[in-house]
């Protein structure tokens, strides 16, 4: 898990010291609730834990936006809801734009703006703000 989250920091345009990487990864593990899993292999994690690792990895280099393609697609309803709550809280806290693709209307309803598509064209736009 640790190395999985560290990878984007090693290849980022900005150079991070070992101390900076340690601080960033420790904070991300805490924010996604995986402090106790830092030495685990992804194969030993549940689907929800793997998604949380992916979120932490995406946040490692402080992006302006996160793009998610079906972030809850392989998860049960309860875990999917938890993942969406985590995503929304993290992007709100860090001021990051979240763009996601989903076929789940319940997940779409958690977003501020929804674009419905059919045949590659936007057929409807809804905005809650």
Please describe what each predicted stretch is:
Residues 60-64:
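A short, proline-enriched helix->beta-strand linker immediately N-terminal to the Walker B motif
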Residues 66-69:
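Catalytic Walker B motif of ABC-type/P-loop ATPase nucleotide-binding domains
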Residues 3-19, 31:
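ABC-type ATPase nucleotide-binding domains, specifically the catalytic core motifs of the NBD
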Residues 55:
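Hydrophobic anchor residue at the start of the ABC signature
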Residues 2, 38-41:
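Signature (C-motif/LSGGQ) region and adjacent switch/coupling loops
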